[in-house]
Amino acid sequence: MNNDILHRYIFDNADVRGEIVQLESSYQEVLSAHIYPVALQALIGELLAATSLLTATIKFSGDISVQLQGDGPVSLAVINGNNKQVLRGVARWNGDIAADASLQQMFGKGYMVITLTPDEGERYQGIVSLDHVNLAACLEEYFNQSEQLPTQIQLFANGKQAAGMLLQVLPAKSGNNDDFEHLSALTSTIKAEELFTLDAEQVLHRLYHQEEVRLFDPVDVTFKCSCSRDRSAAAIKTLPQTEVEEILAEEGKIEMDCEYCTAKYSFDAIDIAALYSGSHSSQSQQ
């Protein structure tokens, strides 16, 4: 049974919707690729949960990228996913990072870029500065700018588990936001330990036991890297053939490493010759 799931829920007595995501296996898969500092482990967990919530909220078919960049010790943290809740991620850092480092201490002067690439239609990109207190507040600002919908986000991660909640006024509903303010106040009382140990139904009962809540069927969230030998070969082929041949002469082979999952793809002289002759096969050995 998959222990990484996202639930949507809606209030029958208010024009408000919500989501809850709880992650463990996919989170550990992302962390296993590199030995991340403690603070960065937590940030990656929050970013995973956030991307899952965003993907479920912004109804579209295609790919999503949530990327943080800055001039601090952490230069990049990115989660890529799609509407099927398949996620992968990686971060780059340099130097020591305190275990309790804040978002600004990790990224310095930075920004968040959310990119939606639908299967059909034009790509959309939204940018928010990282000058808010935490990642959740940055995402709330994104929704304020892009959709102008009152939104509350809660994110938690501890290096082992990650979880998040999203509460939002339904699109096309306007006027009195008293219901949202009331439900937002209830949601803000959630504790990390509750999201890590209780199932979605128990969490919603604890928060909203006096409300009329409908919980929808869960959606699995999974880690899967999209790297492949064919993609690595295509990347090599973008280089001038003379440059590739020089590397081969010096190294005897060309190795491509995936940052996301640490898979290695090796190409020897025979592979490279086949690649440029058009007879390259993805069945070659890694």
UniProtKB/Swiss-Prot annotation:
Q: Which GO terms describe its biological process?
A: protein refolding
Keyword Cytoplasm among record annotations: yes
Give GO MF terms, alphabetically.
protein folding chaperone; unfolded protein binding
Q: Where in the cell is it found?
A: Cytoplasm
The PTM entry states: Under oxidizing conditions two disulfide bonds are formed involving the reactive cysteines. Under reducing conditions zinc is bound to the reactive cysteines and the protein is inactive.
Task: Name the GO cellular-component terms.
Answer: cytoplasm
SS bond partners: 225-227, 258-261
PANTHER family xrefs = 33 KDA CHAPERONIN
Q: What does this protein do?
A: Redox regulated molecular chaperone. Protects both thermally unfolding and oxidatively damaged proteins from irreversible aggregation. Plays an important role in the bacterial defense system toward oxidative stress.
Protein family: Belongs to the HSP33 family.
Name the HAMAP family on file: HslO (MF_00117)
Q: This chain belongs to which protein, by name? A: 33 kDa chaperonin
Q: Which organism is it from?
A: Shewanella frigidimarina (strain NCIMB 400)
Task: State the organism's lineage.
Answer: Bacteria, Pseudomonadati, Pseudomonadota, Gammaproteobacteria, Alteromonadales
